[in-house]
Regions:
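Glycine/proline-enriched, intrinsically flexible loops and inter-domain linkers
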Residues: 1-83, 88-110, 114-530
């Protein structure tokens, strides 16, 4: 392996990251569904020939680092990909997340030799299953949640697998959008491959391959040094989901014990609840992604995000846990639990490194998918939206308002786009006054949005956390907790009715208004007196 001088290594490091970011721009500009092109629920990455992550676009932290788990499954099943191949996978028990997150990988060859892979993961608006959007917290097994793809070739040596494309189109609710978004992913991967080949032409193939290895080894050294500088004390934290979505009112525990051991960070989540009958179980790869995100928040910015860092994060968890469920447990609403796990881990690391601690951000994650026939076109429309809540306050600054916190980072769907694309009118989008936790620095405010149905009927699932005040966003150093999330509905022009269940299925009629409000963030420091 060719050794690279430090200057060339830094040039290549930033070049790899730039390629991943350019892939994301291509996908953003060519995607069909608003959940990708407006809400930015996708990520792109580069990997070496062994499938190790080299660089990742800065999009969705929940997808941070987990693509290499899926790529490992692809390579185990299919072997090294040939020129012109494109592999597709989404199996949650073979390195995937939940079924709507379709992942595509393409090989990159230079001078006749495999040098790496380009990959894209994107949340598709629908992949079939029992409910619109292929998500429902009340699901009890994976088979209800849509098409399951073990690693399979979507394109083989440049020729499309038409039977597979036809199968996909026949089983999803919006086939044009799904096919268009798959094309966008292929375009992103193609651009990534082109740019890597250009780097080889400019610097030489051996230099680029050596730069990948040097980047990972350099990151690994920095990561070990960082973790060795941390206290060896074991710290613990826990948090709760309001319930699992099936058994109303029974909290679900997420517990973590964190300790540095021999230059690695050991994250023990064995104390968490067993897997549940609903879909808030977390695939093993997503559990790792939550841990990688929390670590990313506490390590120095000079340490890149790649396999050199993540290899030093070790997770302990028995199979059968909510954070390591056994097949075929449902997982479509796994992000609710991933959010809480991320918050718990950040709180634990804040105990370990108090000078870097901040108050907790909301983990309410108000999200829903409604399907309705649009009277303007006669076509089925699938509205997906995710609302931001309050961010945690920190020393010297209040919490941010209306952010999609921790591992999510989706953008808010613009009201104008929602009203053009779907038979809904957005009647209110506003900050919830008083929802931030009290403190010397107050927590951020949650966001409320009201939707009026303009079609004859609509149905769909919704879910959100932190309706239970006991599990509000925690304050730090005397700061108060954030306010709760709220769901309301108003029918036939009558009064607002509060819905107590945070996860469920709604049937709407023309003129109904449904309102979701996210929780606020925790405050930092004791609030001023008087």
């Amino acid at each position: 392996m060719k050794r690279i001088d430090p200057v060339a290594q830094e040039i290549l490091r930033h070049a790899f990251h730039g390629v991943a970011e350019e892939m994301a721009v291509v996908e953003y500009r060519s995607s069909f569904s608003p959940i990708i092109r407006e809400m930015l629920d996708f990520s792109c990455g580069l990997f070496d020939a062994r499938g190790r992550m080299i660089a990742h676009s800065e999009m969705i932290p929940a997808q941070l680092g987990l693509m290499q788990f899926t790529l490992a499954g692809v390579l185990d099943a299919l072997g090294p990909l040939a020129p012109g191949d494109a592999a597709l996978a989404n199996h949650p028990y073979l390195g995937g997340t939940h079924l709507p997150d379709l992942q595509i990988f393409t090989p990159v060859h230079a001078g006749g030799r495999l040098i790496g892979y380009a990959g894209s993961i994107a949340h598709h608006i629908d992949v079939g299953g029992a409910t619109a959007g292929s998500e429902n917290a009340e699901n009890t097994e994976l088979y209800q949640e849509g098409l399951i793809f073990p690693p399979v070739l979507l394109v083989e040596r440049g020729r499309r697998n038409r039977s597979l494309w036809d199968l996909i189109r026949a089983n999803v609710r919006d086939p044009d959008a799904t096919a268009g978004d798959l094309e966008a992913q292929l375009s992103a991967c193609r651009r990534g491959g082109e740019r890597l080949v250009e780097l080889c032409a400019r610097h030489g193939r051996a230099t680029v391959v050596g730069g990948m290895e040097g980047l990972l080894e350099g990151t690994s050294r920095r990561a070990r040094a960082e973790f060795r500088s941390w206290p060896r004390t074991a710290v613990e934290a826990e948090g709760f989901l309001d319930d699992d979505g099936v058994t109303f009112g029974r909290p679900v525990r997420i517990h973590a014990r964190v300790q540095v051991h021999r230059g690695a960070l050991v994250v023990d989540v064995s104390g968490s609840s067993p897997q549940v009958r609903s879909s808030v179980n977390v695939p093993w790869a997503s559990t790792h992604a939550a841990a990688y995100f929390a670590v990313r928040c506490f390590v120095g910015a000079e340490i890149p995000q790649n396999d050199g860092l993540t290899r030093h994060v070790r997770i302990v968890c028995p199979e059968g846990s909510i954070l390591r469920p056994a097949f075929p447990a449902a997982v479509s609403a796994r992000h609710l639990t991933v959010q809480r796990l991320s918050e718990v881990l950040c709180r634990a690391l804040g105990e370990l490194l108090p000078d870097r601690a901040v108050a907790s951000s909301h983990v309410s994650f108000p999200a829903f998918v409604f399907q309705a026939v649009d009277p303007r076109s006669g076509r089925l429309a699938l509205l997906t939206d995710i609302l931001g809540g309050g961010g945690g306050a920190r020393p010297g600054a209040p919490g941010d308002h209306a952010i999609d916190s921790y591992t999510s980072n989706c953008a808010l769907l613009p009201a104008e786009v929602a009203e053009i694309e779907y038979p809904f009118r957005i009647e209110r989008t506003e900050l919830v006054r008083g929802s931030g936790g009290a403190g010397a620095q107050p927590g951020g405010l949650g966001l409320r949005r009201d939707y009026r149905l303009l079609a004859d009927a609509a149905e769909g699932m919704y879910y959100l956390e932190q309706l239970d005040r006991r599990f509000g966003s925690a304050g730090v150093a005397g700061g108060g907790p954030g306010g709760p999330a709220v769901v309301r509905i108003r029918r036939d022009g009558g009064p607002w009715r509060t819905i107590r269940r945070g996860k469920g299925y709604l049937h709407l009629r023309r003129g109904d208004v449904v309102s979701f409000a996210a929780a606020g963030g925790g405050g930092y420091g004791a609030p001023p007196r008087g």
